[in-house]
Amino acid sequence: MALNLNPVSTPFQCRRLPSFSPRQTPSRRSPKFFMASTLSSSSPKEAESLKKPFSPPREVHVQVTHSMPQEKIEIFKSLEGWAEENLLVHLKPVEKCWQPQDYLPDPASEDFRDQVKEIQERAKEIPDDLYVVLVGDMITEEALPTYQTMLNTLDGAKDETGASPTSWAVWTRAWTAEENRHGDLLNKYLYLSGRVDMRSIEKTIQYLIGSGMDPRTENNPYLGFVYTSFQERATFVSHGNSARLAKEHGDLKMAQICGIIASDEKRHETAYTKIVEKLFEIDPDATVLAFADMMKKKISMPAHLMYDGRDDNLFDHFSAVAQRLGVYTAKDYADILEFLVGRWEVEKLTGLSSEGQKAQDYVCSLPPRIRRLEERARERAKQAPSMPFSWIFDRQVKL
């Protein structure tokens, strides 16, 4: 999925504007469950991690659940036929989908080792900071079980049985199946590159899936589909920018991989934004209130609870590198918001309640206010320190 913006490199802790990263808080870990391992630790921090329970590296927000009234749930049930005709068309048949092996050396071929050597030669030209971003993107994609779980919390649109034939359930399962290829492909390619510490990466993935995510969507599909619309757009932007940078550094295969993943994300973005477009059509007041609510909460990115067993602020550090490289920035955040405001024609809404009008004004005025902070973000980034990343064998990268 996508990245977040980092308070180290972006000064978004303004009272009047939302920040774009989770609130920095002390770690809160349950005393009940503790990790055990027979492996020796290579650092005091890792030794300490062995005693930590299965809980996020930072506090999550107070959980609000099932905030949507029954009459709104009925709206989603009534949209079952609409979803079948308008949502499922954005899925591709499995036989027409690309698969990771299409872009990887064939291990059964006689020149497999030569192909791997070619990948590793190209990998030498990729700088460490781009590897940090590529690995962070891959880890985000690999936490797919969390995202399917999140979608299946949405009242009126969840998969009630695990194999429900409803259009909403079919979409969620098939979307998950398409997304599953992304992490598989990035993981295998980065493994073959020889430039990254796969054990550290695999630990980070396990920690992240175990921690879950905290999107604050309240089991409410109005909130949930605003969130996924933003996220798919952000992921499209992020992978697209990674493709551009990989190409600039001479790895055309990595550029191709990031590009095809971005193409999938764009198709998924189209589907999710179409859902919210329909909600604006049939229930504009509740939908604009949901849009404003998610923006006031600040869109927390899917991997915001990322942890490698050592760095409690790993996601912030990863995000700072992405911001500095131009992979995902404060400007992108504002651009995505402005895109969605235009896509859903929020400025043209009429007949809203007084609260709906306030929400409309809020989301429409927010993008230019965010953009005014971009220059300050760039200035602060110039003074950022360097940090070691376990994913690249503790090599130092400027934040």
Swiss-Prot record:
Residues 1-57 are annotated as: Disordered. It is an enzyme of class 1 (oxidoreductase). Its EC number is 1.14.19.2. Keywords: Chloroplast, Fatty acid biosynthesis, Fatty acid metabolism, Iron, Lipid biosynthesis, Lipid metabolism, Metal-binding, Oxidoreductase, Plastid, Transit peptide. It catalyses: octadecanoyl-[ACP] + 2 reduced [2Fe-2S]-[ferredoxin] + O2 + 2 H(+) = (9Z)-octadecenoyl-[ACP] + 2 oxidized [2Fe-2S]-[ferredoxin] + 2 H2O. Signal peptide: none annotated. It is found in: Plastid, Chloroplast; Plastid. This is Stearoyl-[acyl-carrier-protein] 9-desaturase, chloroplastic. The lineage of its organism: Eukaryota, Viridiplantae, Streptophyta, Embryophyta, Tracheophyta.
